[in-house]
Amino acid sequence: FYIGAEKYLLQLELDRNHIYREKLVFYPSSKSALLYERLYNEEQGLVEINWGSYLKLSKKSCAAIEGNTISNISVLVAWTKSNVERSRLDGVYQFFAEQMILSLTTSETLASYARESLRNDNEGRLKTFVKKFLQASDFNISDIEIEDEEVQVNEEIRKLFMGLPLPEGFRLDWLKNGILHKEHFVFSHHTSQGDYKLPETMESSGTFQMLVLSVLLYNMLQDGSITVIDELESSLHYELLSYFIRTFIASSEGPSQLLFTTHDLNLLNEDFVRKDTIWFTQKGEDGASELTRLSEYGLHKNISPYNAYRQGKLAPLPFLGSQYID
């Protein structure tokens, strides 16, 4: 990842109980320079940290951070709990706090993210971008609005809702005066048969997915953020998936990055997807996912990755039994 013009690399080896290795370097030149490296001593159950000179932290500060670095939290988290002087870690933490958009998976989380972004779009630039993107994607959407729905609830239901562990981002402006406030999108369509409006519940999943992706795309291009999306192709025609990725590649001039998973093999045939950016996942006997970069298979440049994968020459294909069920 990049902070300004400087390149950083953070490496982690961990499971649910321990962080076994954590290394942060940056590139003041063509060669990397160590900021810190932490290792987990399994025999003693202790964390050991080797500090690089570029951090310029005092021994007292290093000791304070080490004291807060327990086996299952990162050095960056321990740094936030320590009263130490400013260093390069300030910028690194700020990057992950503000420019890392983690995977948005559930439909309600996606909807909440899009609504929150558009609600805070005071100058209307995001909305203009979204409408142009959707129209360029062959949707006849002329406008997008956010409307507030009021639902009258009794005291018993109010108490029930207040006690529920609802997911973060489920946009409920909580139950004031016995009224439940819920926001939803309304889409205006312009067609040869006239204009009409549809609530988000009546739009197709593909339309809504493109709306969310357009919001993500705008924010990535503006903020230079890293965005992680699970199953990017969900509910999308392949041409729409391809259009989104090509638009990101063509428009991204800054440090923004897009990391995504997909089951759509058609991307293996595309020239705009660099082979060194493709990774295959497969489950080992212990159930853990193992990742292998396409370039590690030594595939000849004239051989199609798509055909090689279909022939089982790359990552193993899913083993399927008989289509006849006893």
Indicate where each model-derived feature is located.
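Short polybasic amphipathic segments
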Residues: 20-26, 183-191, 279
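Short alpha-helix of the ABC ATPase nucleotide-binding domain corresponding to the H-loop/switch region
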Residues: 237-242
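Catalytic Walker B motif of ABC-type/P-loop ATPase nucleotide-binding domains
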Residues: 227-230
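C-terminal lobe/lid and adjacent interdomain/linker elements of RecA-like ASCE P-loop ATPase modules
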Residues: 223, 243-326
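Short, mixed charged/polar active-site loops
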Residues: 7-9, 31-33, 193-197, 288-289
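Conserved ABC ATPase signature
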Residues: 162-218, 232-236
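Short, surface-exposed charged micro-motifs
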Residues: 9-11, 175, 280
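Electropositive, glycine-dotted interaction segments
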Residues: 3-155
